[in-house]
């Protein structure tokens, strides 16, 4: 289990994200799409179109991490873009 700092803000990128993007591509999405600093200690969550893959981008003050979760059954429930 990865322990994130208490009180860390979590941002969900609405809609589907191109899951071919890696750390740098997602960091660019955070800057351009969400208007946030990807190095600010917040968690940024992205979901692929089929809904079975989720990526979390996080900078812990030392370096950037990219966590990936793929589920075998069902889908991640995700908000639609406003």
Regions from the language model: what does each represent?
Residues 1-82:
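Polybasic/polar functional segments that serve as interface/processing modules
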């Amino acid at each position: 289990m990865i322990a994130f700092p208490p009180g860390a803000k979590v941002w969900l990128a609405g809609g589907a994200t191109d899951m071919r993007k890696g750390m740098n591509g997602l960091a660019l999405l955070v800057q351009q799409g969400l208007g946030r600093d990807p190095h600010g200690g917040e968690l940024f969550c992205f979901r692929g179109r089929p809904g079975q893959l989720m990526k979390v981008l996080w900078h812990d003050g030392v370096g950037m991490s990219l966590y990936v979760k793929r589920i075998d059954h069902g889908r991640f429930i995700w908000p639609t873009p406003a």
